Design a protein with these regions (language model features):
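C-terminal binding/interaction regions
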Residues: 2-21, 71-143
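Gly/Ser-rich catalytic serine loop of serine hydrolases
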Residues: 29-30, 53, 91
Length: 143
């Protein structure tokens, strides 16, 4: 079993769309990541009618990693709905998630994101955001 199969299998366990209440819907998008130390974490999307409660699976998973380990650096990430990513944009983090992952740790620009599970095609966060606006702030923080 390669790392991508492990991540897919763990994330798939979280996939069971449900109405938590008449206002909150969850588990319809799932995610798993491998942290810098090799530990895997999972999460799921949760949405509420108010809109401000909505959290994508990628952000929930990254927050699970941070809350449970204090880590912020991610090696690999897979996200999907009912099937593994199959190219054409399926499984790609939204703009808010991309931004959060970059802000969480600048080294996350090198994290691998699954594009097509079957062919093992990946991209990096840097591929998705080649001219990220926050690099300058990270550089200034090191002065």
């Amino acid at each position: 079993m390669d790392i991508w199969e492990k991540l897919y299998t763990q994330a798939k366990k979280e996939y069971h769309p449900e109405d938590v209440t008449p206002f909150v819907y969850a588990h319809h998008v799932v995610c798993a990541l491998e942290s810098a130390d090799g530990t895997t974490y999972t999460g799921f999307c949760i949405e509420a009618c108010s809109g401000v409660m909505n959290l994508c699976a990628e952000r929930v998973t990254a927050l699970n990693m941070y809350v449970n380990s204090g880590q912020t650096k991610i090696r690999r990430l897979i996200a999907f709905r009912d099937e593994a990513p199959s190219g054409g944009g399926s499984g790609m983090p939204c703009g808010a998630c991309r931004e959060f992952l970059y802000q969480l740790n600048e080294e996350n620009e090198n994290m691998e994101i699954m594009v097509n599970y079957e062919t093992r095609e990946i991209v990096t966060l840097k591929d998705l955001m080649p001219n990220w606006w926050g690099k300058e702030r990270y550089e200034q923080s090191r002065l």
